[in-house]
Amino acid sequence: ADECMSLQPQHKYVDYGFVDTLVYVQDMDTVLRMYAGTKDYKTVSNSSMTNVERAENTATDKIAVLYAEGQIYDSGSEGIVEDKVLKQIKTIHKDDAVKAVVLRVNSPGGSADASEQIWHAVKTLQEKGLPVVVSMGDYAASGGYYISCCADYIFAEPTTLTGSIGIFGTVPNISKLREKVGLDIDGVTTNKHAALQTNAIYKGMNPQEYALMQSMVERGYDLFTNRCAEGRGVSQQEIKKIGEGRVWLGKDALNIGLVDELGNINQAIAKAAELAGLGQYAIVDYPEKTDPFEELLKMFDTTTPEERLVMKMREFASQPRIMALTPEVTIQ
């Protein structure tokens, strides 16, 4: 209880019997099917019954272009959101007409855990035999490089900001302010580290707590550099020489082996087609690109507050976590 399990390596959860095994989010379906003793399953909820997608034409070979733009988040609605990206990758994985994938990255980084989950999901595409080519935009740094590093081929613009292979943690400390205003903090906990995060903010960290936090950061950096080394086919030590948060222009990243070629997204698509041995192919965007003019017209589709409220409620109800809570409907 006094080892502050929230900051320990994940394997200790198994060692102490808190969990049975460790799996990636992307692999949960496989685990559930194994325990359920079925090869496939399908759930039906009220919202999914009214949200029927049209069958796609799978006669033409496709190249999927997956756009990963913005900050990387564990959850939310804007930027590169873990569950949204994993869902898009799963859709690509299931489409047998997709023969190659271009990952368009325009991100300064973000959540280390979400980056690891997306990295693993990209690997599952490669395990299926799909070539993955990365096209970097203005920046693909930190987590942006993390999700890119396992690609079969990486393009960057000459002025792309990339690299930033590093990880850090910050904990605010307002202990002096608390003392100045005469505020005291107390509570009852089950072990000495149960309120570590709260105490760190209001009271500061003692040497043991600081060591726990530092250990967590160092494990994250070790994993990050290992992923990069594996993806680029070099030693971890070589990655660490150009790591520690250093940021590189695309043209310099080419010289040190972080990318394979300078070029734009069109060249990345052409390279993906080459690696997949494709002649003619269709390009499919994920998420689907919308026409800005059509989006503007949609704003005028409803005129009353009631109608706009209904639209927002439908949008809210269609979220996966909300759908999971809706009652199951049995069709007889």
Put a short name on every predicted segment:
Residues 67-70, 105-107, 136-138, 158-160, ...:
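Active-site proximal loops enriched in glycine and acidic residues that flank catalytic Cys/His/Asp
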Residues 104, 180, 274, 282-287, ...:
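C-terminal recognition in membrane/secretory proteostasis and scaffolding
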Residues 19-62, 225-231, 260-301:
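C-terminal long alpha-helix characteristic of the crotonase
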Residues 112-117, 252-255, 297-299:
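Short glycine/threonine-rich loop-to-helix capping motif typified by GTGT followed
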Residues 60-63, 67-97, 216, 287-332:
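Intrinsic disorder and flexible/low-complexity segments
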Residues 1-31, 175, 179-256, 260-262, ...:
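Charged, glycine-interspersed solvent-exposed loop segments at helix/strand-loop junctions
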Residues 55-180:
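Cleft-lining beta-strand/loop regions that shape enzyme active-site pockets
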